């Protein structure tokens, strides 16, 4: 991938950009095999990759500069701002949005937040695009609601320029820290969720729900999990850390009993909406802590699917899964180091199958799907 920002030394986020994709995949596979070296693996599936540029469906832009000349991008460690509107990881459809946002920031008087001086209002611009219909969700992260009335007043101009903006919100993040968002979300549009579709499964993206940033590879990840589950004798499964329900909604059949658990209520609202659209009445989604939910249940499903954050599922849940002993565990991980650590805490299981998904090209990061079978 050619990147003028990288070539000019202005951005180094894609550390592996000079390596061809096959070399990147080889290095990631070697890393994964090294992490799982202590465990016999029955089957290594070929790694899955997608486009090497224009694949991201989300931009997280730090706003800096002045209200007349805002910069959208990032801050270097020394506080120097860098405009990243030309980043080749973004699809071409993002360019007109960034171009319209800069004059809009001036129109609405949204002074960029100055970290050093602790002054200003506009901290971040968060943009997400749906692959299914090109609709977009735009979030303004502000320090307070001081400029809210001005923003509302100026908004019709922006909506006229960019009719693809289906969901627009303001998030209030009052803390002087590098935290992306606060708890308060104010909707400026009637529509509150972005419609997405992977493999004919309807999914919904709400402002404070996690959603994969590489749709091409994420849809293959979900489809693979579905194919693996269909090969197993499973009538009852749990989907822990389920997010908006991507895995559970793909894996469920009309006669399967499935419970999806996720701590974020926004994500659960999305999952319930999708299940209703699919007419899957035996699916239950609840906003709870996954470990607390699992350890409070009496009935044991045949399959537990886990998709934890980078920290992994942790010893308490590993201990409980070992005691509960479901026949199958599918572990989807964005951090193979913590996954390997967790598998070590599940001594009663063998690794049947492993597949790497290159969700983050040009970096050392990847996703991995692992099928564990009770010995």
Curated annotation (Swiss-Prot):
> Which residues hold S-adenosyl-L-methionine?
212, 241, 262, 307
What family, per the record?
A: Belongs to the class I-like SAM-binding methyltransferase superfamily. RNA M5U methyltransferase family. RlmC subfamily.
Q: What keyword terms does UniProt attach to this protein?
A: 4Fe-4S, Iron, Iron-sulfur, Metal-binding, Methyltransferase, rRNA processing, S-adenosyl-L-methionine, Transferase
Q: Where does [4Fe-4S] cluster bind?
A: 3, 11, 14, 87
- State whether keyword Transport applies: no
Q: Name one GO molecular function term.
A: rRNA (uridine-C5-)-methyltransferase activity
Which catalytic residues are annotated? 334
Protein's UniProt name: 23S rRNA (uracil(747)-C(5))-methyltransferase RlmC
State the Pfam families in the record: tRNA_U5-meth_tr
Annotated function: Catalyzes the formation of 5-methyl-uridine at position 747 (m5U747) in 23S rRNA.
Give start-end ranges for the coiled-coil region(s).
none
Under catalytic activity, the entry for this protein gives: uridine(747) in 23S rRNA + S-adenosyl-L-methionine = 5-methyluridine(747) in 23S rRNA + S-adenosyl-L-homocysteine + H(+)
